[in-house]
Amino acid sequence: MRIIAGKAKGYSIIVPQGEVRPTQDRVREALFNILNPILPGARILDLFCGSGSVGLEALSRGAASVRMVDAARNSCAMARKNLEKSKLIGGSVVQSDCLQFVKRDAGKYDIIFADPPYAKAAGDRDMIAELMMDRLHELLTDDGYFIAEAQVGYGVGDIHTREFPGWELIDERTYGKNTILFYRKQS
């Protein structure tokens, strides 16, 4: 796993062992090709950051700041180590339950990215829906984007068929078993 483009292009990202499922290079590359026009100077919140691969890619490509949040101590340690070794400026790592973090954060972001753990069985928590129903809306700038990675066809994979008050699904891209959902805040 590596940073694909920008100031830190080619940097090898250290990934923690265990249940972490980092966003694949090809999915990140496609995501950032879409975001490229709005990325320079953007303030980004990366929820369920894992090793920090999405946040690091954003900083490498010109984001002004990235706040990376994850509940797992090991993931946060790896994200901090990756941030330090990549020598990218403007990143911070917060160890916190992401749903609780959203309830208390006072920041404003241009882009919020969430890649929560995939549902493994029927009835598992739909963390993307929980985020969208909470105060995530308040953390975005007026022209901000919420981008979620979900698993195709299981658990939250059908989220695109649901409507959430205050949100408009503007794009959906599928890469293998991953779906990237792009939402805009409605005024």
Segments (PLM) and residue ranges:
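Class I S-adenosyl-L-methionine-dependent methyltransferase catalytic core
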Residues: 1-187
